[in-house]
Regions:
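Short surface loop/edge beta-strand patches of beta-sandwich-type extracellular domains
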Residues: 690-709, 759-765
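Substrate-binding cleft and catalytic face of glycoside hydrolase catalytic domains
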Residues: 63-218
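Flexible glycan-contacting loops in extracellular carbohydrate-active proteins
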Residues: 795-826
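Lectin-like carbohydrate-binding module/patch detector with strong preference for beta-trefoil
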Residues: 392-551, 670, 694
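Glycan-recognition/cleft segments
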Residues: 724-749
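Beta-strand-rich modules
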Residues: 609-630
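Short, tryptophan-glycine- and acidic/Ser/Thr-enriched carbohydrate-recognition patches
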Residues: 422, 653-677
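Short, aromatic/His-centered strand-loop micro-motif at the edge of beta-sheets
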Residues: 749-773
Length: 892
């Protein structure tokens, strides 16, 4: 699933929760709960966890001369993160007296050095072969390199560089892709070794690394390196063919041998991520795309890696990093020529976050597109995702038709005609030249797809274009027409606060900026301006019918908090502004200033927070936001503690919806549109899950975080496949609590917390096509499983508590492991208690009775009563679930 679809997903998830609501407003944390397509690779990370720190050296290439690539690299990476450059030696003309380079070869070397001077005139340089320029028979004859001439030619290049520039030469690759350019280079592993031996005898190379490998196909890199590894200080391969396994193995071998792992032609951020994982320490970008590579170079040098995942057969990888300044970013990448489409799931184990503005959620599933074969349908896709949280987050997803309003001037971005400059103008509702469709770019756009397309409403082929692909500050922006967007027409939205964004160009990394403070100023791109001028760089995306103004709504009043066992219900007084869009709910642990936005743009004046932990004390505040995206001051804070008192904290009766009948409002979300069917044990409907369609239910993040736990449900299996999951609460293959109806011979309950796993195998397995009442209790150091009210297995000495696992991915019908079969079954009346109920209680609930403190609706007298839902809305008659009848809880 690509990021372009996130807005649709958010709407779909909301609709799934509320579609059946004819009488209830379900304003709770559960309205944001997604149920994603099962991912190929799942990655978990803790925002505050200790990560892995690396010290890579990243560089840029001019072996294939392209000054634009270097300028893009400087702008996206920052000069401080460029530590090496790759130049090249040529062999188009014979050496004079076996030592003197021709003038045209020197001119090319001087050109490369001059380009590198834009980074630093002392930037370290590595040489490789420029075989595409052509070959002279003096160097190669009958596809066999003349070793002595070849070594002399390399020596002459190094000598010239040392004598005529300040660039230190730190390494030399004797050949470049010698496994492929056999005619041009005449190389072989043996000839590469012989060149290395000659260079090693030369005092000039005493402090210069000789690089081994240097193959196009990474399957061949190890053999090209191993035969001469006693002469090679560095090992290098390209990834233009070859398996993931041999790529990783090559860098692991270099690390084992104490050599420098080097990649002098990286084509995708995936190579950099994988290389770091297995031993690469020096990497050079062959060409330079844009943001993902630049931000990866920054954060990998000034941060810690929190998570890493890979799919070897599909040649893709992903990682999550935390910068030393606190920013967190996720990256996905692939092979340039061999990738297969892969779905990656990112899971935050500590708190709800926003992925490029999508949230508040714990997880995101992102599709990394691939092709249909080697160099077939490949897009060289890569991406970076901002992971954010806090008191002021992006107010919503940007995907629609807007006017772009400049903060400094209050004017909107516009154009007069194609080919002319982008300007600021006073907004006119009738001018479509001031209206823009802003949408995430397609994941098939080619290369980095971390950007947005901005198209004119008047003509969707007209976009905001940086003239001539300029990377210079104060370059002009123009309206330009073409069928598909180019890199100088795509933009990154960087949220700054109070509804404002920076817009940064994909090609240049520079900022869209009003040229002056005038209301009719031209629009340019610039570097970061001094703080006093930065309002010229800030923009809001506003609907066409919303006036731009900067008067914030009044701060909300009357905030109250009602604590329940596993949730906190907030209510507040309504604001009176006519242009009010909604409310933002903020939460922090009591005694901290670590506020996070846990709900956005609520239309009602109540919200039930069920992402809180039982027993912890929280502070809450509410802000108002208007249609112009102005945020109010926060309300006065109020504190509340979900009590954790023994109770049923959630119940799903599957009555054509996944509503929780308790006041905690822990509504579920389903993937695959499972059906509701007759033939039930409670109410009128049951939920049918199809294994072939990979259907499952996701329960809220904190539903199983108590020290003790009871899960009760009715289940009728439609398959006896071993190791299906009735439920599985956890977040990865090392943290789970699951129940399978059969491990092949018996019901199994298993818990794992890191390296510690505890299992309970029962005396029976569940049959197919029969309704069975199943209860699992965990507490007091004991786990018990009941079927139809009878104990079928127990184990004492249980030391793992559900709260130790801290499950956040709580599934009905699927497992944490990608290999676990999906459940084929009908499910009904799922209940969760935050304590271990007794054997007598099991009998009671199986028989339709209620536990202490809750009476049955069927026992209420048939006379008029005051009947309310948990939301306080009066009803004409009791409905399925919990009702408040004459002030008492009644379960129907």
């Amino acid at each position: 699933m690509n990021i372009k679809q996130l807005t649709l997903i958010a709407v779909t998830v909301m609709s799934a929760v509320t579609a059946s609501a004819q009488y209830d407003v379900r304003s709770s944390s559960s309205q944001y709960l997604p149920a994603w397509e099962p991912a190929d690779v799942s990655m978990t990370y803790g925002l505050t966890a200790k990560g892995v720190r690396y010290a890579p050296i990243w560089g840029l290439d001019q072996a294939w001369i392209n000054q634009q690539n270097l300028k893009k690299g400087i702008n996206h990476m920052g000069k401080e993160n460029i530590g090496i450059g790759r130049s090249a030696f040529r062999f188009t003309k014979a050496l004079t007296n076996d030592s003197v380079l021709s003038s045209d070869i020197i001119a090319k070397m001087r050109e490369r050095a001059s380009i590198f001077n834009q980074v630093s005139d002392t930037l370290p340089i590595v040489f490789t072969a420029d075989q595409e320029a052509g070959t002279n028979e003096y160097f190669v004859k009958n596809q066999v390199a003349d070793i002595s001439h070849w070594a002399a030619m390399i020596n002459s290049h190094v000598h010239w560089m040392q004598q005529n520039t300040k660039h230190p030469v730190v390494g030399v690759s004797p050949f470049n892709e010698g496994d492929y350019w056999t005619k041009e280079e005449g190389a072989s592993p043996v000839r590469q070794l012989e060149v290395a031996k000659l260079l090693r005898k030369n005092p000039r190379f005493a402090d210069i690394a000789i690089v081994g490998g240097n193959t196009l196909n990474n399957d061949k890199a190890l053999s090209w390196y191993s035969s001469g590894k006693n002469y090679y200080e560095w090992g290098n391969t390209h990834q233009l063919a070859g398996s993931f396994d041999t790529f990783a193995k090559f860098y692991q071998q270099l690390q084992k041998d104490g050599k420098v792992g080097y990649g002098d032609e990286m084509h995708n951020v995936g190579e950099a991520m994988i290389g770091l994982e297995y031993g690469m320490t020096v990497g050079i970008w062959w060409g330079f795309d844009s943001r993902a590579r630049g931000e990866f170079c920054q954060i990998s040098r000034h941060g810690e890696r929190l998570a890493y995942g890979e799919h070897r057969p599909n040649w893709t990888a992903a990682s999550v990093w935390r910068h030393d300044d606190g920013r967190v970013k996720a990256f996905i990448g692939s092979s340039e020529r061999q990738a297969v489409t892969t779905n990656y799931q990112f899971v935050s184990t500590e708190r709800e976050v926003y992925y490029d503005g999508y949230g508040p959620v714990r997880e995101l599933m992102m599709e990394m597109p691939g092709g249909t074969g080697y160099q077939n349908g490949q897009t060289n896709a890569e991406r970076v995702i901002d992971v954010t949280w806090g008191e002021d987050v992006a107010p919503g997803l940007v995907n629609g038709i807007y006017k772009l309003v400049n903060k400094q001037t209050g004017s909107v971005v516009a154009y007069e005609s194609n080919g002319n400059g982008i300007v600021l103008r006073k907004f006119s509702p009738t001018s479509k030249k001031q209206q823009w469709t802003v949408k995430p770019c397609s994941h098939q756009t080619g290369g980095d797809y971390s950007f947005y397309d901005i198209e004119s409403v008047e003509n969707s082929k007209i976009r905001i274009n940086v003239r001539d692909y300029s990377t210079a500050s104060r370059a002009e922006l123009i309206a330009w027409t073409q069928d598909k967007p180019s890199s100088n027409e795509q933009w990154y939205l960087e949220y700054i606060g109070n509804g404002y964004y920076y817009l940064r160009n994909r090609e240049s990394a520079l900022y869209m900026t009003a040229a002056t403070d005038a209301a009719t100023a031209r629009v340019l791109q610039t570097t970061m301006l001094p703080e006093a001028n930065r309002d010229r760089m800030l923009f809001r995306f506003l609907p066409l019918d919303v006036d731009y103004e900067t008067t914030a709504p009044g701060k909300p009043h009357g905030l109250t908090a009602e604590a329940h066992a596993a949730s906190v219900k907030l209510t507040w007084d309504a604001n009176t502004e006519e242009d009010l869009e909604g409310y933002m709910v903020l939460r922090a642990l009591q005694g901290t200033d670590d506020w996070n936005t846990i709900a956005r743009k609520l239309k009602v004046t109540e919200f039930t927070d069920n992402t809180c932990c039982q027993g912890d004390t929280y502070a809450y505040r509410v802000k108002a936001i208007d249609l112009a995206q102005n945020l109010s001051e926060a309300s006065e804070s109020i504190s509340a503690t979900p009590s954790g008192e023994r109770s049923m904290i959630a119940r799903w009766q599957m009555e054509n919806n996944l509503y929780d009948d308790t006041q905690n409002m822990m509504d579920g979300a389903a993937y695959g549109s499972p059906a509701y069917v007759d033939g039930v044990k409670s109410g009128t409907k049951a939920l049918r899950l199809s294994a072939t369609k990979k259907q499952y239910v996701q329960l809220p993040y904190e539903v199983a975080c108590s020290d003790e736990l009871t899960v009760s449900l009715w289940v009728s299996l439609r398959s006896t496949t071993a190791f299906q999951r009735i439920f599985d609460f956890g977040y990865d293959e090392n943290h789970y609590l699951y129940l399978t109806p059969s491990n092949g011979t018996a019901i199994r309950l298993a818990m794992k917390n890191g390296d510690d796993e505890q299992k309970l195998d029962c005396s029976v397995k569940l049959p197919a096509s029969q309704w069975k009442h199943v209860v699992v209790t965990i507490g007091g150091g004991k786990a018990v499983v009941y079927v139809d009210g009878q104990e079928v297995g127990s184990r004492s000495g249980i030391t793992i508590r559900p709260s130790d696992i801290r499950p956040v991915l709580n599934y009905i019908g699927r497992g944490q492991l990608s290999t676990s079969p999906f459940l084929a079954a009908d499910i009904d009346d799922v209940r969760i208690y935050n304590y271990a109920i007794s054997a007598e209680d099991v009998q009671t609930i199986m028989g339709g009775g209620e536990l202490t403190g809750v009476m049955s609706a069927k026992d209420t007298p048939s006379v008029p009563h005051k009947i309310y839902g948990l939301d306080g809305v009066r009803r004409t008659e009791p409905r399925p679930g919990l009702n408040i009848i004459d002030g008492k809880k009644v379960l129907r």
